[in-house]
Structures are given as structure tokens and as C-alpha cells.
UniProtKB/Swiss-Prot annotation:
SUPFAM superfamilies referenced in this protein's UniProt entry, alphabetically: Winged helix' DNA-binding domain
Family membership: Belongs to the UPF0502 family.
HAMAP family the UniProt entry points to: UPF0502 (MF_01584)
Protein's recorded name: UPF0502 protein Bphyt_5265
Family annotation (InterPro entries): DUF480 (IPR007432), WH-like_DNA-bd_sf (IPR036388), WH_DNA-bd_sf (IPR036390)
């Protein structure tokens, strides 16, 4: 499963701040989703951190705060600054520093950006970073991340009323004992139903529609026309 040498044992790094984790996640995400704009300028990085969709929690960080987070990540070698542009641009070095294959990096990135997720949610939300064949393959890489030394993710206790355990990254520190899954928690688990998978997909699509609507309104404002004219006849 592991395609990166010695990834199971890596030097531990200090716990990241919430904003450092967000910055790192944004850099990995944008490398895949907007490769033409990567590495990112400080402005683009700040916009990515403050995105309203695909982020939990939603932030309102300033460029100065983001730059402080970048400096902290640079000291850990997790972020590098390019020297080929007049405008400073930043790129991540997460895979090499943490010894992660691309599959594990994709899962860790979604956890950094969206918070706790089930394996099914991770498969849907990571599709633009890596296409997992099925939920079992997601779980295999999560188990591998949890078995790393130090562990990079942990399985959380199941939320009452939910059928699946969620997972959380550990790059920003340990989670409380009460949140951890206990041995035997999965014994009475019920496989994720098709209905639940559809609900997760509907949420993802709703987020995407919201993003596109915002883009349409912005374009309409720039063109000086009514936003409704852009969708007339649909």
C-alpha cells in the first residue's frame, strides 16, 4: 500500500496552529485544482483560506495572519517560497516532509480543510485530488496513516445517530480521549447505505452550485448586467 520509503516512521513536528493547518491544506488543494496558478501568491492563498465552501470552520484571516502562518510552516520545511517571480509565491512540501504517498496526502488535505469526515465523505471530497476506487481503499490508507509513527490521523467515536465513524487529522495536536473510537465500536456498525452516499454527494453539489452562483453574480457585476440575464432560457 505504501509507496513512499520509510513513511511509517518520520521525525515528529510540533503541532500546527489551526491557520497553519489551513494554509497547508489550501496549498495542497490548489496544486491539484488550479495548477496554472500554483505556486500561490499571498493574496490567492488568503482567499483560499477564507473560502466559504469546502472549509470548516470558515475563517476570515488577514494577509498578515496568513503570512505569519506561512513563516511558521517554512521553519518546519512544510512550505517553500519560490524565487522566480517578483511576487512571492508559496508551495507546499508536505509529501516529502511527512513521507506521504499522494493518496494519503489527499485524505490528510481534506481533513485539514473540512474537519472530521467519514471514509465515504473523504472519498467524495477528495475526488479532485485523487480518485479512490472505493471506500475500502480510503479506509486502507486511513489505517496506514493511523499506524504511522507518529500517527497522522485518528478514528473518532461515532456520533449518536450516525452509522459511520469519522476520522480526524492529528497535525494540529491530539484530540480528547472522549472523542476517540473505542475497541468494539465498529462491531455493530452498519455499512454505509446508498442513501447516505447520495446525501453526501448532494451536499458536495450544493456547495459547488453556491460557488458557481457567486461567480455568476461577480461576472454580472463586472459586465454591468442583471445576473438573471446570464441564465435566461435555462
Amino acid at each position: 500500500m505504501n509507496s513512499t520509503p520509510d513513511a511509517s516512521s518520520r521525525p515528529s513536528i510540533r503541532a500546527l496552529t489551526l491557520l497553519e493547518g489551513r494554509v497547508l491544506g489550501v496549498l495542497v488543494e490548489k496544486q491539484h485544482t488550479v495548477p496554472d496558478s500554483y505556486p500561490l501568491s499571498l493574496n490567492a492563498l488568503t482567499l483560499g483560506c477564507n473560502q466559504k465552501t469546502g472549509r470548516a470552520p470558515v475563517m476570515n484571516a488577514t494577509e498578515a495572519e496568513v503570512l505569519t502562518a506561512v513563516d511558521g510552516l517554512k521553519r518546519l520545511s512544510l512550505v517553500m517560497e519560490g524565487s522566480s517571480s517578483r511576487v512571492p509565491r508559496f508551495e507546499h512540501n508536505m509529501n516529502r516532509v511527512l513521507g506521504l504517498p499522494s493518496q494519503s496526502a489527499a485524505l490528510l488535505t481534506i481533513l485539514l480543510l473540512r474537519g472530521p469526515q467519514t471514509a465515504a465523505e473523504l472519498r467524495l471530497n477528495s475526488a479532485r485530488l485523487h480518485g479512490f476506487a472505493d471506500i475500502s481503499s480510503v479506509e486502507a490508507f486511513l489505517d496506514e496513516l493511523a499506524a504511522n509513527d507518529p500517527p497522522r490521523v485518528v478514528k473518532l467515536a461515532r456520533v449518536p445517530g450516525e452509522r459511520e465513524n469519522r476520522w480526524m487529522h492529528l497535525l494540529c495536536g491530539e484530540v480528547s480521549v472522549s472523542e476517540l473510537a473505542q475497541p468494539g465500536d465498529e462491531d455493530d456498525s452498519v455499512p454505509l447505505s446508498a442513501f447516505e452516499a447520495v446525501k453526501a454527494e448532494q451536499k458536495r453539489l450544493a456547495d459547488e452550485v453556491s460557488r458557481l452562483q457567486t461567480l455568476v453574480r461577480r461576472m454580472a457585476a463586472e459586465l454591468g448586467i442583471d445576473a438573471g440575464d446570464l441564465t435566461a432560457g435555462e
